[in-house]
Amino acid sequence: MSTARSDDDSWEITESVGATALGVASARAAETRSENPLIKDPFAQVFLDAAGDGVWNWHSAPQLPPELIEAEPTIPLQQQAMVGYMASRTAFFDSFFLEATGAGIRQAVILAAGLDARSWRLPWPAGTTVYELDQPRVLEFKESTLAEHGAQPACNRVAVPVDLRHDWPEALRQAGFDASAPSVWSAEGLMPYLPAAAQDLLFDRIQGLTVAGSRVAVEALGPKFLDPQARAKRRERMDRIQALMARIDPDRAVPRTDELWYFEEREDVGEWFGRHGWDVRVTPSDELMAGYGRGRRRPRSATSCRGTCSSPRSGGRPEGLAFRQGESRARRHRRDVAGQHGFGNQCGGPDCGSAQHRRAQVDHPAQQRGFSDDAPDAAPAERGEPGERGGQVVRLVDARGQHRGVLEPLATALTQVRAHRMSRVADHHDGPARPGPGGGAVVKVVAQHLVAGRRCQHPRNRFGPIGESCLQIGQFAARRELPFRSALGGEPIQAIRTHRHMAGFDAGTKCLAGQLGVHRRSPHRAMRCSRRTGRRAGR
């Protein structure tokens, strides 16, 4: 049982469970301000400023009290690990929702939404409705704070103020939710705050509200959540921190998060969904963090849980739910080597390690077709991995939706380039460029040919906003190399001339775009540039 909870307790944003949402916002704000952020949440700091000073600001504070660090030297490392974990968790759920809506789902349900601002910051497809469920005062704080700053949701957002321990399915239906249509669900940072019986009831209700094609992602509890020794060690450490803070800063109380949790025996989340016919993939949190470049570490004993990832069951019982399938060193090496030699759709089967063999979802049991690694309709342009600089991949898709190559992140690219025309020079025009739904800077690609002995410029496709990157991929130089550097400090990209034909880009460590400037029916042959030899490769 929880020592600080009751069956019908409620809270303001600065107290009890509500204050934990501010702690998560603090971690997201710290990650957003980092040198190579995995996520971008500009609203996190807005919530912190509105809530005022409190212990929840520790993650985003420039420095902690020296007395605290002297007494607990491991706090900075633990703080850094927490920020990395929250960033990885947020990135996973972001990708999970975008991939589900990219597959055609237009109903999203965020359970215990807290200060999650996905309704405002994600590029939702047109016609998507996002239902946010949480305590009334928490949702009211979020809405009023963002409204004061002029923020507008990027979807049809529907707030459902309700306690998840009560009859929330009826409130969800009354808000307009259609249980006969596929939907995508998330339960992020929720499980330890629910009694075991309430957790089972929550899953039963999700089961009754979902149909074929639906997906669910859950952050599940780790194996040491109920371990008596781990609990005692955590309690002793919190006692020391509380006593120290009472001396150096009496006005800033340190909350006992463990007193808000329900330490009760409960069924493993992965086994529950597997027993009810769902296809489940399990990955521990350390593999999730390693996959996002946030370091490999042991699973945390409490909230570092495991989450959900997709794939049909291949036999055997699932060990739990997980966020994202990790990637071995050998698999990552094969992918990187493939990326250095020509680019394109690098796929060597289910074990090749390419991004197209990972999706963030749990498939509904009624969806018999499910998801297969070699499914022909698996839309490779819908998947990808973050690159070594922490940005999301940028995909190039031709007019028929076919895969045209994957660009490792240019600076902090956060969106996808899709469905651009790849036809004759005459089809291109120099009309006005419009930012896409992400609101970032427009990237214009200009191709230059040598026609009848003279230069002739033709504007290429205008790629809608790539995150907040202001990178300009400039002209192809006729007789020299021109380096271009991202406004956010990305690697210089060189436009290399090969005889009279277009060539690829070389960033020194990665072949970024072997086919970026290719005309499918151009009078000039399309060229690619080999990173090692620089020799041309005609098509």
Curated annotation (Swiss-Prot):
Matching InterPro entries: Ppm1/Ppm2/Tcmp, SAM-dependent_MTases_sf, SAM_mthyl_Trfase_ML2640-like
GO terms of molecular function: methyltransferase activity
Enzyme Commission identifier(s): 2.1.1.-
Family matches, as SUPFAM superfamilies: S-adenosyl-L-methionine-dependent methyltransferases
A GO biological process held by the record: methylation
Residue span of region Disordered: 290-392
Biased composition range(s): Polar residues: 301-313
Keywords assigned by UniProt, alphabetized: Methyltransferase, S-adenosyl-L-methionine, Transferase
Residues noted as binding S-adenosyl-L-methionine in the record, renumbered to the chain: D134, D163, L164
Enzyme class: transferase
UniProt xrefs under NCBIfam families: mthyl_TIGR00027
PANTHER family recorded: S-ADENOSYL-L-METHIONINE-DEPENDENT METHYLTRANSFERASE YKTD-RELATED (PTHR43619), S-ADENOSYL-L-METHIONINE-DEPENDENT METHYLTRANSFERASES SUPERFAMILY PROTEIN (PTHR43619:SF2)
Function: Exhibits S-adenosyl-L-methionine-dependent methyltransferase activity.
Protein name as annotated: Putative S-adenosyl-L-methionine-dependent methyltransferase MAP_4079
